[in-house]
Amino acid sequence: MELIKGNIASPKGFYADGKHAGLKRKRNDIGWIYSEVPANSAAVYTMNQMQAAPIFVTKDSFKNSAKLQAIIVNSGNANAVTGNQGMLDALSMRAKTAEKLAIPMDTVAVASTGIIGEMLPMDKIMTGIDLLEKQTGNAADFEEAILTTDTFQKQISFQTEIGGKTVTMSGVAKGSGMIHPNMATMLAFITTDAAIPAELLQKLLKIKVDKTFNQITVDGDTSTNDMVVVMANGCAENPLIQEGTADFEKFAAMFQAVTEHLAKSIARDGEGATKLIEVQVKGATKTEDARMIAKKIVSSSLVKTAAFGGDGNWGRIICAIGYSGGRFAPDNITIKIGGIEILNHSSQTIFNQQALDAYLEEEHIVIEVDLHIGLESGTAWGCDLSYEYVKINACYRT
């Protein structure tokens, strides 16, 4: 597997574009991804019960077959909690995109992100779709078009050889605030020219989302609009990937690399964030317990503020473990911060405070927890909680 300098349109047969339609003041705010042939596809969605209209429309596109040829996305307006009119507007976005690209409506996915509760300015949306270019667009413009409070574009591309063919996979994501996925707003789109059955793609997507996107948190809020969509158009002409083969393992490893990079990029770009926090839990009896405990630690406001202030207060970590709901033995917990052991079998150790203080000034903080009761492990990612987070969200609409 090789990291390459690419974009969401790097896999063969894919194109992308983005334009400024006027939903936001300056940046691009509408874009699409297009495959020149129908692609086997898979998707996962937010667990928030107040799901936005685009979620329902995308689910409808998957109803008859798991094939997509385009994804249309707008930012600046979530089209969430907008009633029947919001549903009609999302359907209109799908229909307009299908018409412009001359493809069936049920091969178009729709995604939106932005302010909740306001109606889409459909005149601007329709004009924006008309501006999008089918095969001569700029993928970087698409990457900008999906952003809201993000401070940087999030994308990654890899290549590997499968069955004697070069297979490319690219991913792009947005997310900065309202991030606590079970599947938060977090949008991610993955393209690949691999040939793989849709059913296997869906199974693999669910596994990788559980290990990566569902293990990040910024502020504990789960969005109405979360969506991850992957399209595999087969243009690499590799032999069809089958589960349990060496080719599948190669593809799965590349999939893991893409989703983990995007997840960590979202966590690193948390609103107002100055540090990425990574929590690694091992020694659990179940993977689910390890993941649950890791995520509870990284979700703790007290842990997040301690990270911002450079305070190695392990009491906040042990407290989060205690209410996590995961199984552990209270007398058997070991904690390290930046490799510095500060707790051994639930007793504080003698450690170098100056070294710990210096480490906590770094931009990537790793907390290791060993439960000493099993062999399973799990990782979660988040960010610190700063003054700037409050400022951004207090003034979001203005």
UniProtKB/Swiss-Prot annotation:
It is an enzyme of class 2 (transferase). GO terms for molecular function: glutamate N-acetyltransferase activity; L-glutamate N-acetyltransferase activity. The active site is at T185 (nucleophile). Substrate binds at T148, K174, T185, E271, N393, T398. Its main location: cytoplasm. It comes from the Bacteria. SUPFAM superfamilies: DmpA/ArgJ-like. It is found in: Cytoplasm. Keywords: Acyltransferase, Amino-acid biosynthesis, Arginine biosynthesis, Autocatalytic cleavage, Cytoplasm, Multifunctional enzyme, Transferase. InterPro entries: Arg_biosynth_ArgJ, ArgJ-like_dom_sf, ArgJ_beta_C. Pathway: Amino-acid biosynthesis; L-arginine biosynthesis; L-ornithine and N-acetyl-L-glutamate from L-glutamate and N(2)-acetyl-L-ornithine (cyclic): step 1/1; Amino-acid biosynthesis; L-arginine biosynthesis; N(2)-acetyl-L-ornithine from L-glutamate: step 1/4. One of its GO terms (biological process) is L-arginine biosynthetic process. The record marks A184, T185 as: Cleavage. Its EC number is 2.3.1.35, 2.3.1.1. The keyword Amino-acid biosynthesis applies. One of its GO terms (cellular component) is cytoplasm. It catalyses: N(2)-acetyl-L-ornithine + L-glutamate = N-acetyl-L-glutamate + L-ornithine; L-glutamate + acetyl-CoA = N-acetyl-L-glutamate + CoA + H(+). Pfam families: ArgJ. The record marks T113, G114 as: Involved in the stabilization of negative charge on the oxyanion by the formation of the oxyanion hole. Heterotetramer of two alpha and two beta chains. Catalyzes two activities which are involved in the cyclic version of arginine biosynthesis: the synthesis of N-acetylglutamate from glutamate and acetyl-CoA as the acetyl donor, and of ornithine by transacetylation between N(2)-acetylornithine and glutamate. Belongs to the ArgJ family. HAMAP family: ArgJ. This is Arginine biosynthesis bifunctional protein ArgJ. The gene is argJ.
